[in-house]
């Protein structure tokens, strides 16, 4: 009589304990599959029907999904299979899907996962205002959102987000080039009290009006990125220094209208600023020119 086959297709040794004989709920799911990268799960589910069922049960219980764990490029079918049963996600990162991710791909996932607290959609240029509306409407606990390089994000989309996301703390709007001062002012007035981390980098239409309103409405703001915001000047920075006592870091590189006197008050408070003071810049330049930094006596 031939020995029985195990689920993987091999022969089962008499008295042998197979992996799938271990308790799924108490052992395999919390202590084994939780440590297997998503890419390997795609291979594992092909071994047998039993392994496929185990992997599907694990995926249905995911709390965090980062598409980067699958690879730099993930096919649409693979994403749909990985997320089809997930109903308890708290973190979702889909940047590797940026070339093809559409509203039709994303909206059903959002609808099944109302507990989402962190969503990263950087570079997902095929989405539209509909997806952001579904996120704002269906995920009231949302705290962190990245929309960097999403050109479709406009003032109306941001207003909907500000109206429906009371828990929002971190927002990345880098290179959302349709946004203007009016949209940022509305965001500050509606959600400024809870904002701690905000990036408006590379938004040429954002200026002092937006920065001053953020300063007056965001007392807990800790990190602000204004890199490349060409319309931001010293007036906005002075208002930040006056109204944002919790500020820890400020990015103003390529903000050519921001002068050192407006930054000095923040430097004295220990705020990390990515632009060096003029004296340091001069010493670095001199070092580059002559090969060493001479001793400079600053005493008069």
Swiss-Prot record:
The lineage of its organism: Eukaryota, Metazoa, Chordata, Craniata, Vertebrata. It is found in: Cytoplasm. Part of the SCF (SKP1-CUL1-F-box) E3 ubiquitin-protein ligase complex SCF(FBXL15) composed of CUL1, SKP1, RBX1 and FBXL15. LRR repeats lie at residues 141-162, 167-188, 194-215, 220-241, 246-267. Residues 113-269 are annotated as: Interaction with SMURF1. It comes from the Eukaryota. Keywords: Acetylation, Cytoplasm, Leucine-rich repeat, Repeat, Ubl conjugation pathway. Transmembrane segments: none annotated. CDD domains: F-box_FBXL15. Belongs to the FBXL15 family. Residues 19-66 form the F-box domain. This is F-box/LRR-repeat protein 15. Pathway: Protein modification; protein ubiquitination. InterPro entries: F-box-like_dom_sf, F-box_dom, F-box_LRR-repeat, Leu-rich_rpt, Leu-rich_rpt_Cys-con_subtyp, LRR_dom_sf, LRR_FXL15/At3g58940/PEG3-like. Substrate recognition component of a SCF (SKP1-CUL1-F-box protein) E3 ubiquitin-protein ligase complex which mediates the ubiquitination and subsequent proteasomal degradation of SMURF1, thereby acting as a positive regulator of the BMP signaling pathway. Required for dorsal/ventral pattern formation and bone mass maintenance. Also mediates ubiquitination of SMURF2 and WWP2. The gene is FBXL15. Its main location: cytoplasm. Signal peptide: none annotated. The keyword Zinc does not apply. The modification N-acetylmethionine is found at residue 1. GO terms for cellular component: cytoplasm; SCF ubiquitin ligase complex.
């Amino acid at each position: 009589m031939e020995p029985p086959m195990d689920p993987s297709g091999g022969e089962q040794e008499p008295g042998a304990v197979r992996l799938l004989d271990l308790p799924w709920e108490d052992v395999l799911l919390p202590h084994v599959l939780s440590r297997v990268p998503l890419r390997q799960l795609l291979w594992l589910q092909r071994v047998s029907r039993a392994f496929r069922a185990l992997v599907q049960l694990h995926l249905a219980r995911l709390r965090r999904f980062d598409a980067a764990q699958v690879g730099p490029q993930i096919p649409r079918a693979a994403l749909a299979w990985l997320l089809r049963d997930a109903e308890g996600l708290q973190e979702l990162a889909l940047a590797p899907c940026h070339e093809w991710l559409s509203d039709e791909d994303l909206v059903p996932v959002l609808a099944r996962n109302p507990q989402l607290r962190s969503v990263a959609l950087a570079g997902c240029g095929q989405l539209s205002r509909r997806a952001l509306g579904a996120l704002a409407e269906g995920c009231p606990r949302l705290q962190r959102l990245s929309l960097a390089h999403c050109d479709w994000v406009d003032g109306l989309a941001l207003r909907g987000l500000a109206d429906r996301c009371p828990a929002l703390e971190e927002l990345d709007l880098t290179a959302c080039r349709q946004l203007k001062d009016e949209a940022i002012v509305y965001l500050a007035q509606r959600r400024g009290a809870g904002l701690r981390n905000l990036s408006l980098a590379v938004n040429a239409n954002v200026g002092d009006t937006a920065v001053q309103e953020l300063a007056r409405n965001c007392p807990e703001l800790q990190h602000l990125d204004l890199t490349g915001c060409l319309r931001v000047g010293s007036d906005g920075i002075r208002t930040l220094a006056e109204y944002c006592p919790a500020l820890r870091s400020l990015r103003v590189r390529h903000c050519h209208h921001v002068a050192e006197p407006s930054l000095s008050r923040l430097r004295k408070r220990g705020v990390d600023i990515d632009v060096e003071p003029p004296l340091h810049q001069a010493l670095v330049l001199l070092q580059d020119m002559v090969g060493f930094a001479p001793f400079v006596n600053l005493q008069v």
